Each structure stands twice: as structure tokens, then as C-alpha cells.
Amino acid sequence: VLATHAPNEAAIEEVFLAKNFQSALKLGQARGVAMLAAGRANIPLREFAAKTVKQAICGQGQAAKAQVQNMVMKTLKLTENPGEDAADALAIALCAGYSKTGDKAHARFRLSSRSRSGSRWRMKDESA
């Protein structure tokens, strides 16, 4: 995927506490591979908390997966539901784009990417 599409940057969801050990292990392995691939290709990688992604896409950090899917479909003008996993990936990509470009639809807020204390929303200086 990296060789075919040559992205300038990558974004992934931060680790969350999973109730299922097997799921957490598989997620950790997938994240590790994604981080390694981005690192080897010298592609900057940013992480976003699920709550931050939901805030950016739906306007509330506690949005349900169905709400995220619906907003991703509307935002990208998709005619078919991409499914939960694909919608999550697209939402993370949109969140990364919004945080970098200051997209006018989300111009009231500037998104800070991950810091050790977690992601957070800040009021954007409208005079800038």
C-alpha cells in the first residue's frame, strides 16, 4: 500500500483497553506492523485517541460506531456503507486531515495530535 500510494504521512488510532486478550494482542501486532512500515518508509505517523476521532467526525467524543459510519459516508459522499473497520480507518484519516489543514467545516477547533497527556481540542485563534 505504501509503495503504491506513496503517502506523505500516516495516522493510526491510539491503543485502548480491550476486554478480550486475543483481540488486544492482534490489534497490537497490526499496529506494530503499521508503525514499522511507516518508520521504514520515513513516513511521519500520528496517533489519535478514538474519542478525539469521534469528536472530529461526529462532534461528540462518545459517538456510536453507527454515527461514525454515517458521518464518514456523508462527508465522503459514499453510496455504500464501508463497514465498521473501514469507516474507522477513514474517520482517522479525516481527523488527521482536519487537524493538519484546519478544515473550514471544523475551523472552530484545532486538533492537537497525540501527546503523552493525550489528544485534546483547543479553541482556534480566529484572527490568525
Locations of regions flagged by a protein language model:
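Phosphate- and other anionic-substrate recognition elements at nucleic-acid/protein interfaces
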Residues: 1-128
